[in-house]
Structures are given as structure tokens and as C-alpha cells.
Amino acid sequence: MPTPEKARQIEEISEILRTASLAILTDYRGLSVADMTAFRRRLQEQQANFRVVKNTLTRIAAERTGTEVITPLLEGPTALVYSMGDPVAAAKLTLEFARQSRILSVKGGLLAGRLLSAADVEALATLPPREELLAKVVGGLQAPLYGLVSVLSGPIRGLLYVLQARVRQLGGEEAAEAA
């Protein structure tokens, strides 16, 4: 039976695994407290956080939330980078920090209940931000509509030119400009 403190930690980790849009498991061995603090600050700007977790408690939390797929990643010192916002921004920031520090390493992650390898997390980080993807989708939807408007207005425009030419023939230039 876990102590009340461990039970609270299990519940907190369970909540993270249940609600986070992305959870990245990292090995933080050798990372200084100052570096961790700076990394946490940068993550908080992106609605993300960094938390050192115990593997046994995380394993229990994963079993309770149906995310047991992460248990193979729970070896050695583990810290969770989790995002409640844009998962791409959190992945980019984590990989950028890992490259800069040369100490933090990505073990893998969890996205929508699916296990991500370290390579998958890197691939996720190369995606454009959510807003840019949405803009591309909207642009893709608008382009056919503009084409349809062009096609439908073509015959009307042609009729207008024919009528203006006829008015010029019948009444002269002044009548055509007035029309």
C-alpha cells in the first residue's frame, strides 16, 4: 500500500498522462538545477512543464490510465515534459534544449495514447505550428471556392461585355460609359 504522499504523486502523474496533449519522457542525468529551472521557464511559456518522476510511481500511474505502452521507457532517471497546449511547440522546445545542453536526452513520448520513439518525437518537432497547419487547411478549402466563383462569374462577365458593345453600337460612347 503506497504512502499518502506516493498516492498523491501517482494521482498527479495519472492526471498528466490522462490530460496532456503530449508527454515526452527524458533522461535528465547530469542536468544542473539552474538548467532545469531555465528549461521549466521556457516550457511554461508554451503551456508545458517539466517534472522529475519516479519510474515505479509512473509505471503504476500508466497502468491506471491505460497508457502502459510507456513502461519500456521507464529505465534510469526519468523526467516528463508534458504539454497541455500545442504538442509541436513542446517537442520543438525539448529537442532544442536537448541539443543545447547535450545532457538531456529524449527516450520517447506519448501522443494521444500512442507510444512515440525518440525519432517520432523528432519528426513531430519538425511539423509546422498548429496555426500554420490550420491556415494551410483553410487556404486549401478556399482555393476551390475562388475558382468556382471565377468560373461562375465568367459567363456573366462575358454577357456584360456583349451588352456594353451593343450599347456602344446603338447609342455611342457616352451611353456605354453610363451603363
From Swiss-Prot:
How it assembles, according to the record, is: Part of the ribosomal stalk of the 50S ribosomal subunit. The N-terminus interacts with L11 and the large rRNA to form the base of the stalk. The C-terminus forms an elongated spine to which L12 dimers bind in a sequential fashion forming a multimeric L10(L12)X complex.
Tell me a Gene Ontology molecular-function term this record carries: structural constituent of ribosome
Q: Which family does it belong to?
A: Belongs to the universal ribosomal protein uL10 family.
Entries under InterPro entries matching the protein: Ribosomal_uL10, Ribosomal_uL10-like_sf, Ribosomal_uL10_bac, Ribosomal_uL10_bac_type, Ribosomal_uL10_CS_bac
For this entry, the protein name equals Large ribosomal subunit protein uL10
Query: Quick one: which gene encodes this?
Result: rplJ
GO biological process annotation, one example: translation
Note the superkingdom of the native organism: Bacteria
Keyword terms, alphabetized:
Ribonucleoprotein, Ribosomal protein, RNA-binding, rRNA-binding
GO cellular component terms attached to this protein's record: large ribosomal subunit
According to its UniProt entry, the function of this protein is described as: Forms part of the ribosomal stalk, playing a central role in the interaction of the ribosome with GTP-bound translation factors.
Q: What is the lineage of its organism?
A: Bacteria, Pseudomonadati, Thermomicrobiota, Thermomicrobia, Thermomicrobiales
In terms of SUPFAM superfamilies, this protein maps to: Ribosomal protein L10-like
Q: Which PANTHER family match?
A: 39S RIBOSOMAL PROTEIN L10, MITOCHONDRIAL
